[in-house]
């Protein structure tokens, strides 16, 4: 639609004034700025990467991972750190809970020697560290574990029984307002791990669950992932891991409400080989005959655990299966934007 000449001149003048005040590019016409592919960081789970729609979590955005205790939230965040480090990224872990298990992180593939770690004394300190790291432009990924542990200093200094209504929510709201724009400019991703609480006096319809820290994080997060443990995995009588469901309840860069299920093995993290078998069977890439699993003319093993062990030792076959799975589901790297189930048995026989 052609603009009136006077309006066009007025708009051009306004753009020049804005560029002079705030820097070139502060206001542009949509047609003048190229459409860019969203960069992503893999979660370490093939299924969750596919569910997220762009091959992982988006860079330069705020991500929230929440769920009940022992559901795999921190494990998932550590897997993202490991994947980011593999690409040469610099990562930081703000351990507000003072509970980071370094030996476990190493087993998940985290380069602990080069991981920046802070154990802040109170919430304001944690969020100031977050802001400083973000503004440096040198850090690719920051994990905050957890929102519930970001206790305001006034609450720590106060007496037991003192009322501090809404302090944490205001703290989070202020911090998110300050860092959101900087994150995008610096292409820094922040993952907030959060816990679930029950709503007090909840009656009638709606979920009785809510996350801590107020509503600000819900609004500022580009992606929110709900992580739940749905089954305990056994080998004979021994518990060897958990079956986890991750639901993308909010997604600003791809369609939301997609789900993924994967195994988290004790001491190992997300079982990537297990996902290859699960998706391979569903897509008829891996054949299942009784308890035997095979790929083409190659026997993978009897039972899922033996097949997983085979794929661990034969990376070429695992990569081939993964490529076929991605090809069958469709490329997850095609989302662009403007701007810089089957139930599984709880008992796994080997």
Curated annotation (Swiss-Prot):
SMART domains: AAA (SM00382). It is found in: Cytoplasm. Keywords: ATP-binding, Cytoplasm, DNA damage, DNA recombination, DNA repair, DNA-binding, Nucleotide-binding, SOS response. PROSITE patterns: RECA_1 (PS00321), RECA_2 (PS50162), RECA_3 (PS50163). InterPro entries: AAA+_ATPase (IPR003593), DNA_recomb/repair_RecA (IPR013765), DNA_recomb/repair_RecA_CS (IPR020584), P-loop_NTPase (IPR027417), RecA-like_C (IPR049261), RecA-like_N (IPR049428), RecA_ATP-bd (IPR020588), RecA_C_sf (IPR023400). GO terms for cellular component: cytosol. The keyword Transferase does not apply. GO terms for molecular function: ATP binding; ATP hydrolysis activity; ATP-dependent DNA damage sensor activity; damaged DNA binding; single-stranded DNA binding. This is Protein RecA. It comes from Wolinella succinogenes (strain ATCC 29543 / DSM 1740 / CCUG 13145 / JCM 31913 / LMG 7466 / NCTC 11488 / FDC 602W) (Vibrio succinogenes). The lineage of its organism: Bacteria, Pseudomonadati, Campylobacterota, Epsilonproteobacteria, Campylobacterales. The gene is recA.
